């Protein structure tokens, strides 16, 4: 598994994301404040973050500062840049494809939340050391706009056909976990011998490589292209929101790898006890009941 993930990062090509440092630390203690770095859609007004934070604050008395740091890979990069003087207590969104990179940067502290054995299915546990606590999961899928004037593809190789020229929206695998997940999907299907040829054939059909899911999916629903990488659960949002069945999660014969999103305690966090309390709450029934209707 580690070899495959290393290969994925090599395929993407080496890079360094540099973020400006966070706001000046006002107080070294801040015992009552929990600082969380999370990805854009988690923090948005329609995402689960605001409701989870509100419920946590009301239950525990902690004050939460939730900072949107881009997509999940950017959350990881920001925390890595600050690791000599961490400004966050909890990172949200580091997934199974980013776990090894996060561990190699030594930015996470092992912590197993209270009641984890009772609340978390053993199949979802990301690592035995509990550097990450799983809180959300779904399988990747291509989402298709059924109103489009092109037929729905039935497999990954179909995506390389001329009929889909400039009709596919993907996410940058350097900054986006869906983008990285799609690369992992193609590697699993084509292997090292075939992945380069697949991507060369796919390139003319890519409208854009968006920096994150939020931007990419927004372009898709704006009608910029009829295909986007997302999750099997994405169409349910539109139905829940009172829309019709326009958007369809395509079921291919192979693939659809699962993404398991985790949250972790930052190593040398300024408020580790507050961070632990938040992780305890994030896997609780109260928090988990918020996620299905806010995290699609």
PLM features per residue range, with description:
Residues 1-34:
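Short, low-complexity disordered leader/linker segments with a strong preference
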Residues 35-65:
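Short, polar/charged alpha-helical segment
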Residues 37-49, 70-74, 86-225:
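Extracytoplasmic ligand-binding site segments that recognize negatively charged/polar headgroups
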Residues 52, 155, 194-198, 270-282, ...:
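Short amphipathic alpha-helical coupling segments at ligand-binding clamshell hinges
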Residues 97-101, 221, 225-246, 295:
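A ligand-binding cleft/hinge motif common to bilobed small-molecule-binding domains
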Residues 138, 166-175, 199-203, 209-210, 242-267, 281-296:
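Periplasmic-binding protein-like
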Residues 141-148, 259-274, 290-291:
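A bilobed periplasmic-binding-protein/Venus flytrap-type ligand-binding module shared by bacterial periplasmic
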């Amino acid at each position: 598994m580690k070899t495959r993930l290393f290969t994925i990062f090599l395929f993407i090509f080496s890079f360094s994301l540099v973020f400006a440092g966070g706001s000046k630390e006002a107080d070294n203690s801040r015992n009552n404040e929990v600082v969380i770095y999370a990805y854009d859609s988690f923090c948005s007004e329609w995402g689960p973050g605001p409701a989870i934070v509100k419920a946590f604050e009301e239950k525990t008395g902690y004050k939460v500062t939730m900072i949107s740091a881009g997509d999940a890979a950017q959350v990881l990069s920001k925390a890595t840049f600050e690791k000599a003087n961490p400004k966050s207590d909890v990172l949200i969104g580091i997934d199974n494809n980013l776990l090894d990179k996060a561990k190699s940067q030594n930015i996470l502290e092992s912590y197993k939340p209270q009641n984890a054995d009772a609340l978390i299915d053993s199949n979802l546990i990301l690592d035995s050391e509990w550097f990450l606590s799983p809180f959300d999961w779904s399988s990747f899928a291509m989402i298709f706009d059924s109103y489009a004037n092109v037929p729905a593809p039935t497999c990954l190789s179909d995506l390389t056909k001329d009929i889909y020229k400039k009709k596919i929206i993907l996410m940058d695998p350097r900054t986006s976990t869906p983008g990285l997940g799609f690369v992992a999907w193609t590697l699993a299907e084509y292997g090292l011998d075939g992945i380069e040829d697949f991507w060369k054939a796919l390139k003319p059909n890519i409208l854009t490589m968006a920096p994150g899911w939020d931007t990419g999916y927004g372009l898709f629903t704006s009608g910029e292209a009829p295909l986007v990488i997302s999750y099997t659960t994405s169409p349910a949002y539109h139905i829940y929101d009172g829309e019709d069945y326009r958007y369809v999660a395509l079921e291919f014969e192979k693939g659809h790898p699962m993404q398991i999103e985790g949250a972790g305690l930052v190593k040398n966090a300024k408020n580790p006890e507050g961070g632990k309390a938040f992780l305890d709450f994030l896997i609780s029934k109260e928090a988990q009941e918020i996620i299905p209707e806010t995290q699609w």
